[in-house]
Amino acid sequence: MVKLANPLYTEWILEAIQKIKKQKQRPSEERICHAVSTSHGLDKKTVSEQLELSVQDGSVLKVTNKGLASYKDPDNPGRFSSVKPGTFPKSTKESRGSCNDLRNVDWNKLLRRAIEGLEEPNGSSLKNIEKYLRSQSDLTSTTNNPAFQQRLRLGAKRAVNNGRLLKDGPQYRVNYGSLDGKGAPQYPSAFPSSLPPVSLLPHEKDQPRADPIPICSFCLGTKESNREKKPEELLSCADCGSSGHPSCLKFCPELTTNVKALRWQCIECKTCSACRVQGRNADNMLFCDSCDRGFHMECCDPPLSRMPKGMWICQVCRPKKKGRKLLHEKAAQIKRRYAKPIGRPKNKLKQRLLSVTSDEGSMNAFTGRGSPDTEIKINIKQESADVNVIGNKDVVTEEDLDVFKQAQELSWEKIECESGVEDCGRYPSVIEFGKYEIQTWYSSPYPQEYARLPKLYLCEFCLKYMKSKNILLRHSKKCGWFHPPANEIYRRKDLSVFEVDGNMSKIYCQNLCLLAKLFLDHKTLYYDVEPFLFYVLTKNDEKGCHLVGYFSKEKLCQQKYNVSCIMIMPQHQRQGFGRFLIDFSYLLSRREGQAGSPEKPLSDLGRLSYLAYWKSVILEYLYHHHERHISIKAISRATGMCPHDIATTLQHLHMIDKRDGGFVIIRREKLILSHMEKLKTCSRANELDPDSLRWTPILISNAAVSEEEREAEKEAERLMEQASCWEKEEQEVLSTRANSRQSPAKVQSKNKYLHSPESRPVTGERGQLLELSKESSEEEEEEEEDEEEEDEEEEEEEEEDEEEEEEEEEEEEEEEEENIQSSPPRLTKPQSVAIKRKRPFVLKKKRGRKRRRINSSVTTETISETTEVLNEPFDNSDEERPMPQLEPTCEIEVEEDGRKPVLRKAFQHQPGKKRQTEEEEGKDNHCFKNADPCRNNMNDDSRNLKEGSKDNPEPLKCKQAWPKGTKRGLSKWRQNKERKTGFKLNLYTPPETPLEPDEQVTVEEQKETSEGKTSPTPISIEEEAKEAGEALLPQEENRRQETCAPVSPNTSPGEKPEDDLIKPEEEEEEEEEEEEEEGEEEEEEGGNVEKDPDGAKSQEKEEPEISPEKEDSARLDDHEEEEEEDEEPSHNEDHDADDEDDSHMESAEVEKEELPRESFKEVLENEEAFLDLNVQPSHSNPEVLMDCGVDLTASCNSEPKELAGDPEAVPESDEEPPPGEQAQKQDQKNSKEVDTEFKEGNPATMEIDSETVQAVQSLTQESSEQDDTFQDCAETQEACRSLQNYTRADQSPQIATTLDDCQQSDHSSPVSSVHSHPGQSVRSVNSPSVPALENSYAQISPDQSAISVPSLQNMETSPMMDVPSVSDHSQQVVDSGFSDLGSIESTTENYENPSSYDSTMGGSICGNGSSQNSCSYSNLTSSSLTQSSCAVTQQMSNISGSCSMLQQTSISSPPTCSVKSPQGCVVERPPSSSQQLAQCSMAANFTPPMQLAEIPETGNANIGLYERMGQSDFGAGHYPQPSATFSLAKLQQLTNTLIDHSLPYSHSAAVTSYANSASLSTPLSNTGLVQLSQSPHSVPGGPQAQATMTPPPNLTPPPMNLPPPLLQRNMAASNIGISHSQRLQTQIASKGHVSMRTKSASLSPAAATHQSQIYGRSQTVAMQGPARTLTMQRGMNMSVNLMPAPAYNVNSVNMNMNTLNAMNGYSMSQPMMNSGYHSNHGYMNQTPQYPMQMQMGMMGTQPYAQQPMQTPPHGNMMYTAPGHHGYMNTGMSKQSLNGSYMRR
């Protein structure tokens, strides 16, 4: 018959079907086409055609089930058919479908034949029966029938029903019915799975049986009743007929079953089955536990000399072959059962092999399976005996065994050992290591398959262990290592020492421990190597660095152990290397400035080695020091030995005596001189050269400090203590406020730390600094010790302290020393101390508490994770870690603290170039010593932080060093990092607690912004920080909230008395700053001011880390600290935001760092005014509070009246040429009070402090309120809901509400909190940023390309990046949603709380242009935005400003720009105006949509807006974008992703933005509306925006108030959670407007929209949101992206796009703006062009490509002029994003 289909193609199709079925999938047409096209390259269309033809041919079966077509191989229809097409004759095809040949088959006969042939004791499974039958050559015609398997199953089932077969589980056995000699047991269930089968022996078969006696000889019962009165079969003796119950005979069920099948004899009649002599030597007869046959012990095979213990099975039952045991037999059965590839049911290899007798066939069957050996084996098997095949009782044939032996011998040869492993007691007994073959001394816990080998092969460089020489040789060719994986810290001649971090090189260190255990008796550490540093000594030649030995030490050891384990390889022993390593460990201890000691207890060998070393060291010391007064302390200082060890050694040398109640050291000159003579005659082979050490300790202890230095330290300590008292007071207040986040003591200690460093500057050196405190205490000790007098003869030294100590082996002294060392002053980070010294030493103590972390016990540890880490001072160690002593250690080991990772990061950062910059800035930080200087420094710090963020690339190193830091509180660590690094995400944590006052959010945003600025390099850090921040953010947020809360109380009363408010805050800030200072000082001491900024960041990060860690446990303690941290970060953030904006504006790219400073100053100046303003209003009005915390926030939060008032302020700010100034103004408002104090300190301090204070205030204010209400995500969500409520209720009142009300709103609704953020955003970012952005972004705006790159760079590198509204906003967004999932939940609230997100968006929301256009708009908004498009934006801005965005108009607009809006940034760029116009036009369009004011319902309001808007365009198409659908996790994930890819961030954000745009679009649209709505919100100040905007006054006002910034944020992050419908609404709402807005604001606006939904304002945000969103994205750089992405989270795709958009710097936002404009398609297009250029410039090509992608989602979601928007949005959003990004 002619086939229609090509037979080759049919074969391919059948193969594909089999392949698909093997993968347990349904062979659908699509899968088949795909499989064939991938494997054979045939195009799918052809495959599809051939498949249809094959079906017509009948070559393929088509099966339709439930409307789905599947295809089957007619020859292999079932899953178990084992015949593969082509394996057997094609006869199968003819038999296809015809079962005629199966009708005459006797299935019972076949089944019985198979079961008996298989002879499986427990019965045979159907599968094995089938295999067996298929292997029978005479049954091929039957078995090849396709229906064979099915019919066989049916036959087996029927046979069981008929009683012919017995079924036990899956096993079938023949039911012989009577005991006729067949071996199959009758009672299958009783047959033991473990006992071998039994069968009659030849001589037993025809024996007569006696009639059974029906009574049990034991219990006299019958078969109806045994001893337990239960029926039981009787066993009867075949010879005498006496019977017994199995239970009476104590037979187990298995034995009973076997016995019933045999000829059983009772014990009297038992005959030996071997010799068959009855009654002979019955005492020596054994009874088989399987068949109960009897055997004489001498008749057994092999004969037995004594009775075996336990179960005994006779040779008859036992498998005969090779004496294989029962269990082996069982294993063989299992092997046999699974020998065939079950994975390939279609070709049962063994069966096929058995059926195919030719060698060729066998080989074919075996193709691809096993080695030729196996194939041959199978051939032999087949040819030798078919019967053997599947079911031999013995299963293993001779051939099998031979092959096995052969293979075993080969394998032994390969691993070069005899076939037996001699039992040497050590595993492995020999290792080959390099050119040495070394006998091991002890066993080591290598994996079993390696340890049991007689010889193990180790790579001498990477220490990997291998089984054979071959593997080693292969490995050595590939192994690229020639030295340990670490920094070389010592090199002299051919000796090097490497410092390997167990956390970074885990595998190497584990292998090193396993190797060491081979030569150490007592060693317990093998796998948990992360907390240890390994100092590996190598001998170097041309081949590499060969391992000589090593010692390990804990990074953070409470007991100051400097060695935990030490080992020298046997081939290098007795060459002085042990002494070398011991000496090296003490050298490190001396460098750390603290005494060290080996870990106790010592092993015998260790004791001998150490005692010899100690004796020589002390004798040499005494030889060189002939002073009359020799104290143990002096010896300790000189040698690094701990006093206890010195005392012990002196006792051993008999050189210590008790005289006159005191201890004296006796000089035994003979001993000393003899020792020195020996030394001269036999000089040491490998002497340690201290000058060759290139290593900086993390901790510097006081031991090495001179007396003067010690005195200085003492003085510093006293100062610190004083400061501590102040701090205590402050802390108590703050901690009370802070919900007892941190115990005052802890804060105190922190501050003390800071102070102590301050004081220490007196000492003047880093090392000395540390020692300052330590030495102060030590000094006292020493003074006591100095009292010791030495006799000239036996110069005796009396140590009053040491008298008792000495006797107690100086335990007391040791304790004293430890205390000293651990004492915070002592421990105060040496580096921090040093840095402080380097800095102008301002005795002015940090305002209330000196942050001195007093966990000195930790400090004791000197941990230098990496040399790099060591090199870096602990900028924020003090601040970050509560315990100074942990500093070095903390940094490395206490990463767990979360602080430490940051510290490390800081260290590593600090070394970077940024450090230089930061150093310059750090100089300001030097001022930190004083409260005012601290503030100054804080400003610098924030700048530095930004820069540090940039520097963070180095810190990233630290991260690398602490990949496992994650374990150690990575989250916290990351959080800290984020904070320090200016992670927006981190800062955004507050949004998580949306209710945090917007100020707080703003501050955080700013901080994040600043961090973000720094974060271009730190992006990876940011990513990590984001991850950490995700965990941390919520905590941070809570902390901040709490912090804010306390500050808020301060602020409320103190706002009017700025100084009062500022003072507590300032104090906190000062403390925070002090921490920063200390960190900075430390960094400076480290020698890098940059370190300082990094340090500040680190500190911030670390503190956040600590804070989160402590937060719950030590909330009281931490609260203040956290407050300080928060404040500091906040301030920094604020400042950073301002700086960033200023910087960006002033020098978008080039002067990022300098500009930030200038900006900072500008901002500070402005901020002082602004902060003051903000601070004052802050307490009075939510607006002000927000202002304080965040200008945007203030605006958003402020009630309409405040908004109205603030807008004036904001306009002032706007009018202020630089957005920085605007932000500054706002910052000043917030900061002014703080600034006043700062002013007291230094101008620089004031600058930074103003922001810090502002941030702190906002944080505290918000925190106080939010603290209560929004400590948890739940609270945050509640806040969101409240926001929604506020949206309706708070429309006008919200603005009107006092700060407290707003804050309450914050509490209840994130909106309020967002407001603060928007205010801050606006103020910090927008306001300052606008000018800065305009300057920086001026380029961006006009030529996106030009700006793109620089701007993007700036965005990433310069504070501006963070500064842009985006940064704040995005930080918040990212923080909330992205950095922390918790935050995201909160973010949901936050997102939903325009308040939270709108800190960025807020400005945007109200002043759509303001936020979106914020940078440009906001500024432009008031001025240029006002122009056509701008007009709307301005209106929106004004509305924003007047409404919740009060700040927006005046502050918000520019601030928004400055802080949050990349778009704003973009807009800020002069051309931005047009963009703004475009946006504005959108805003204008939005104006009508804004009428959707009725949207008051959060979600509904938005929808209403959108519906109204959309009624014309998208009216019906509200696509509820499942904003909320995005889980926080997803958001976080997205955020992380964004963070991970900063560049992609722009695009991603854009795309996501757009995608979300769809959903966000709606929200954005809504946001636009909301902005219009916000106008209503703004109603108090708001009609200004637009009547249309006002439509959802209710919605708008609350959302507006908080939402604008928060909205944007929330929208960005919250869009996810925000109303889907709302999003859709946005999309729908005003086709042009919404669409445009959506795209424009989509990212942030999405959040805004959500906010909008939640708050009418949110919609307002939409337009502004875009700018802001852009800003946010841009500011977020990473974080913003994430946030916006989260906003877009609503649509996962969108979210991704958002992420891209966010990366683009709010690409979405701009598109949203476009959306806004897109009502004006021209604008939209224009925007896209502009954004496109910008984006392209910024992101390179990505921007646009992504944007288009984004556009589709955007367009999709929006369905609003998707084309325009898509592109427009894409272009515009991207542009904005890019612009903001670039800035960043």
UniProtKB/Swiss-Prot annotation:
Residues recorded as bearing Phosphoserine in the entry: 355, 756
Compositional bias ranges of the Basic and acidic residues kind: 938-957, 1055-1064, 1088-1101, 1107-1118, 1144-1163, 1224-1240
Catalytic activity: L-lysyl-[protein] + acetyl-CoA = N(6)-acetyl-L-lysyl-[protein] + CoA + H(+)
Biased composition annotated in UniProt, kind: Basic residues: 835-854, 904-914
SMART domains, alphabetized: H15, PHD
Renumbered residue ranges of the record's region Negatively regulates HAT activity: 361-425
Residue span, SAMD1-like winged helix (WH) domain: 1-77
Name the UniProt record assigns to this protein: Histone acetyltransferase KAT6B
Species of the source: Macaca fascicularis
Gene that produces this protein: KAT6B
